[in-house]
Amino acid sequence: MADGDDRGGKRTPQKKNVVVESNGRAYVKATFNNVIVTLTDQYGNTISWASAGKMGFKGSRKNTPYAAQKAGESAANEAYELGLRRVDVYVKGPGSGREGAIRAMSESGLEVASIRDVTPLPHNGCRPPKRRRV
């Protein structure tokens, strides 16, 4: 191997210099098990994302409003540093962290222009899972 060849070593991920418009979209997917927050530009290109699992929560703690708040805060701070200022929020799913994620994004400095619920509703499609007996 040559002296300048550094294969096999750990690579440090480099931040891309992304030019971000001030307007964008925030997608909050709140399932029964996790919360995923994705911030994109107007064209759907991802600027930043975070989930309760990425924030270090495991198991049943991932679907708490506090975990959703931390995920929303992390994604919003990263996008704010890149220049995002105003978002339209699209919420999907029945999870408990919907409001917490939106509140955290607005407290992080992002202006929430609108909130839309895009939860898919079946027109009597698949049979739902059986009820839990605890």
From Swiss-Prot:
Pfam family, one: Ribosomal_S11
Domain of life from the UniProt record: Bacteria
Family annotation (InterPro entries): Ribosomal_uS11, Ribosomal_uS11_bac-type, Ribosomal_uS11_CS, Ribosomal_uS11_sf
Keywords noted in UniProt: Ribonucleoprotein, Ribosomal protein, RNA-binding, rRNA-binding
A molecular function GO annotation: structural constituent of ribosome
A GO biological process held by the record: translation
UniProt GO cellular component terms: ribonucleoprotein complex; ribosome
NCBIfam families, per database record: PRK05309.1, uS11_bact
Assembly and oligomerization: Part of the 30S ribosomal subunit. Interacts with proteins S7 and S18. Binds to IF-3.
Family: Belongs to the universal ribosomal protein uS11 family.
Summary of the function given for this chain in its UniProt record: Located on the platform of the 30S subunit, it bridges several disparate RNA helices of the 16S rRNA. Forms part of the Shine-Dalgarno cleft in the 70S ribosome.
Protein name, as recorded: Small ribosomal subunit protein uS11
Species, as recorded: Salinibacter ruber (strain DSM 13855 / M31)
